[in-house]
């Protein structure tokens, strides 16, 4: 779980458009992980 969060600073190195897509994808990924964890716990 934490290794996803550690990747966030890397987004600054990518161009803004890629940045936005990556941030959106990460947001959904983190959301689904959180929901899954909540569901199984």
From Swiss-Prot:
Protein's UniProt keywords contain Plastid: yes
Localization: Plastid, Chloroplast
Keywords of this entry: Chloroplast, Plastid
Keyword Chloroplast found: yes
GO cellular component, as recorded: chloroplast
Similarity section: Belongs to the ycf15 family.
The protein's name in its UniProt record: Putative uncharacterized protein ycf15
Origin species: Cucumis sativus
């Amino acid at each position: 779980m934490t290794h996803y969060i550690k990747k966030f600073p890397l987004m600054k190195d990518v161009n803004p458009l890629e940045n936005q897509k990556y941030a959106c994808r990460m947001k959904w990924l983190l959301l689904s992980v959180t929901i899954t964890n909540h569901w199984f716990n």
